[in-house]
Amino acid sequence: MSTGANKRGVVVAHPLGNQFVRHLTHALVAKGMLAEYCTCIDWRPGPLAECLWPGGVRAEMQRRSYPEIPASLVASRPFREFMRLVAGRVGLSALTRHETGALSVDAICRDFDRWVARRLPGEVGGGIVYAYEDAAAATFAVGQRLG
């Protein structure tokens, strides 16, 4: 959970992370403007964890690693996304079916969006919110209400 140190800064929300988000958050951290980065998985393994995971799982988790962002500025909601990754690996395709599966990317994004929206009033206050398409409707609605 974030400390919300910069309550007037920028909240960046992206459930899965991507290269642009990495560059954006890195720049905001460098300028002292990142209030919080919200994502599903923030992988911060120790050396033992790196050795124990099979190569494919380790590579997937490393994509969810944000070492350039202080842990105090990251809020994560890992359970559903982690379960989606597991379901995909063990062949439970009904759970991950596009748009309709309980663990589909669409369902993960909707859940993530509602979670970020609930965090805004208490954690961030009147800062700026930067979020993405399918995971932003509720977040933007709350952000607009907060001003």
Q: How should each PLM-predicted stretch be described?
A:
Residues N18-R22, W43-G46, C51, V105-A117, ...:
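An aromatic- and histidine-rich active-site surface loop
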Residues R77-I128:
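Conserved nucleotide-sugar donor-binding subdomain of glycosyltransferases
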Residues T3, T25, T39, T96, ...:
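Residue-identity detector for threonine
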Residues W43-R44, A71-R84, G147:
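Short, solvent-exposed beta-strand-terminating loops
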